[in-house]
Amino acid sequence: MGNDKRVRKPEWLKISIGANERYTETKRIVESHCLHTICSSGRCPNMGECWGKGTATFMIAGDICTRSCKFCNTQTGRPLPLDPDEPTHVAESIALMKLSHAVITSVDRDDLPDLGAAHWAQTIREIKRLNPETTTEVLIPDFQGRKELVDQVIKACPEIISHNMETVKRISPQVRSAANYHTSLEVIRQIAESGITAKSGIMVGLGETPAEVEELMDDLISVGCKILTIGQYLQPTHKHFPVAAYITPEQFAVYKETGLKKGFEQVESAPLVRSSYHAEKHIRFNNK
């Protein structure tokens, strides 16, 4: 996986993380409740912008993942037992932040009999109990394709359920640990068939072609996906999958136009876009 011929990062990807008062307060709430966020563990380039607006994507079920995807910076290994108080802590933090829309994700918990599905459902219910006016978006793992586990999340009634395809069909086996392209499509199909808005996200710059991205779009449309996010892959460390190319802002604009023409209701496509970027804008598509 080592690649001495690294592609130079272009100017449009160079950002600074500002720390305004809202950023500091968001950081204080997250740390005081011993919460994990994908913003920090995933080294998200938008953390300054989002935390500065008082929004964050909470990561539940711990901060150690049972999988080791070659694009992801989340720690891998043997996770700790689930914290039964975590659903309440997350819900309380959302109340303190006065969020109108909350985004939740998790590590994979292949070590648990139910892969964390009950914990997921309880977290969503607790958020709704303490924050009845807050809408929720959840970015879920594949639950190994077990429909009864995905159904537990569906029955908790979040407004949007997202499951990321991550990359095109050809590259998926190279970078997604224990995940399967077609299994992910079936998870998204199950979400869409439930009536809940289905969303997915991909990274580009891994060596895919525009034709492969269009094929992935067609696959997502065929299973009922309504919202798509597309962002530049950034190699977290030299041990991770190398960046094959930095996609230009112009090509991202083409992907957005193509996706909308193919039938997505919303496409976020730009170099720094990540799964939950501008997630609050997407909720309106669930309320038509």
UniProtKB/Swiss-Prot annotation:
**UniProt pathway annotation:** Protein modification; protein lipoylation via endogenous pathway; protein N(6)-(lipoyl)lysine from octanoyl-[acyl-carrier-protein]: step 2/2
Q: Which SUPFAM superfamilies match?
A: Radical SAM enzymes
> What does this protein's record comment on cofactor binding?
Binds 2 [4Fe-4S] clusters per subunit. One cluster is coordinated with 3 cysteines and an exchangeable S-adenosyl-L-methionine.
- Which residues does [4Fe-4S] cluster 1 bind? 39, 44, 50, 276
Which stretches make up the Radical SAM core domain? Answer: 51-265
> Cellular component terms, GO, for this chain's entry?
cytoplasm
Necessary cofactors: [4Fe-4S] cluster
Q: Output the Pfam families linked to this UniProt entry.
A: Radical_SAM
Q: Where in the cell is it found?
A: Cytoplasm
Does the UniProt entry include the keyword Ribosomal protein? no
Name used for this protein in its record: Lipoyl synthase
Q: Origin, by domain of life?
A: Bacteria
Gene that produces this protein: lipA
